[in-house]
């Protein structure tokens, strides 16, 4: 209904997750709240330690899947999407990114309020992210297709040292400790982050 702001509270991989192969979608007028207020530094550091233990135990039957500490507010998973509009939402207290799209094209993110994201993840995420954008129809022209505008974004920062089980090939960092258990830096946590787009995009 006009003027209503339905609230979605989540503690898993995402508040609103757009499934693979879903395109031409508008997500508008929601409040999405993650579990960040229920987590503290000791819990998040213990989760990072557990992630390292599971990743380095050489036991293929164990894997890390604690999405509680990295869940995203509104995102497209890791599948490609195009022609998506995310507008007039309030997204907050997400442990991972508030709004994120990977491998996507023709994305509009506008007039959202985003705050208190990324506090408890060791995955080096940021509040609003467009990662590895691709031209889904091969239209590598001068058209502006990925638009982030009119958002209010604040108090989004990482508190936990970066660790990742496997770096992407295009990470662009030559530090041998980057993202390993020995890495002692807190990484990323920006308000808006556009990264690693397809070279021909």
Feature map (PLM): residue ranges:
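Right-handed parallel beta-helix
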Residues: 5, 10-194, 199
């Amino acid at each position: 209904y006009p003027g209503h702001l339905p609230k979605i509270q989540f503690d898993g991989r995402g508040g609103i997750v757009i499934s693979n192969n879903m395109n031409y979608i508008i997500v508008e007028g929601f409040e999405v709240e993650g579990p960040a207020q229920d987590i503290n530094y000791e819990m998040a550091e213990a989760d990072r330690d557990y992630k390292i233990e599971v990743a380095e135990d050489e036991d293929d039957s164990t894997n890390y899947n604690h999405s509680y500490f990295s869940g995203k507010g509104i995102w497209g998973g890791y599948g490609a999407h195009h022609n998506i509009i995310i507008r007039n939402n309030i997204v907050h207290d997400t442990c991972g990114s508030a709004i994120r799209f990977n491998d996507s094209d023709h994305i509009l993110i506008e007039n959202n309020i985003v705050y208190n994201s990324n506090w408890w993840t060791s995955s080096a995420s940021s509040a609003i992210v467009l990662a590895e954008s691709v031209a889904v129809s091969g239209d590598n022209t001068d058209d502006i297709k990925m638009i982030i505008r009119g958002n209010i974004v604040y108090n989004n920062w990482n508190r936990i040292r970066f660790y990742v089980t496997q770096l992407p090939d295009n990470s662009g960092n030559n530090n041998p400790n980057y993202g390993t258990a020995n890495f002692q830096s807190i990484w990323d946590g920006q308000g808006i982050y556009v990264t690693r787009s397809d070279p021909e995009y």
